[in-house]
Amino acid sequence: MGDEGLRALPSVDRLLNEAATPALVAAYGRPATLGALRESLEWARARIRAGGAAPDAAALVARASQSLEERLASTLHSVINATGVIIHTNLGRAPLSQAARAAVEDVARGYSTLEYDLDAGQRGQRSLHAEQLLCQLTGAEAALAVNNNAGAMLLALTGMAQGRGAVISRGQLVEIGGGFRVPDVMAQSGARLVEVGTTNRTHVRDYETALADGADIALILRAHHSNFRIVGFTTEPSLAELVVLGTRHGLPVVDDLGSGALLDTAQFGLMHEPTVRESLAAGAALVCFSGDKLLGGPQAGIIVGRAAVVEPLK
């Protein structure tokens, strides 16, 4: 009975000539349709060997159609965020506002001035659109947007400290979501990691010692603690103190703000987060932060700061 059922199965060519198959080829392409039909035949053979009945050609094509539909269906679905985490990076990060969605739809439905200067009648700069707004929002001289904040830090370290030292407190060598670790990003950039202080206590004098050793140091890096806090017997220099130290040694300070608040979050009853303007006002030469968390935009890493520092990164 098993062998008879196997012999009764239609060939792939016959399945291709079934009435419903041309629509599958038109929708999914011939290679994908062929693959799905062959998978249907494999399923049928296994079913027959297990004692089941042999399906007819129409049933095999219907199974292939269902397989193609499921395989190519979107895996993104709307969900309700009941986690208690307001901005959940695994659930799409910050939802886009209605105004932002409308602006995207308005531009994305056709051609745009993404990289064209209408007044000059020639190619323009695609980064200019975001840069102008970011400079207005933060007070920075120049700005640049990349894929994510890890990418922003990687670009900054590569452009400013490749082959040279970058000084950072041991308490800031954190790992953020997605497995991004500050030491790994620094290693990939080609910068040499110079750790100072301890996990819970780092002083200005620790930075001073590292800078006085005669090592080739390019910058001082301050990294956001991400989503954890060390409490108790702790201390670390303020950004202003690091800027004073950097100025004395002729070194820029790069401040990785993580989520990157543009507004004072305390006014909404939340813990105060350092704002981008505060970092720049304190004297940071360059500030990196995310565009898809507190800023409320799509996934992005944003770099703002002095023009002399940002421009070479472009």
Task: Give names to the regions the model predicted.
Residues 9-10, 80-84, 295-298:
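Short Gly/Ser/Thr- and Asp/Glu-enriched loop/turn motifs at secondary-structure junctions
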Residues 13-17, 35, 42, 62, ...:
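Solvent-exposed alpha-helical segments within well-ordered globular domains of core cellular machineries
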Residues 50, 54, 86, 90-94, ...:
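Short gly/ser-rich anion-binding loops that grip negatively charged ligand groups
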Residues 51-96, 102-103:
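Long amphipathic N-terminal alpha/beta scaffold segment
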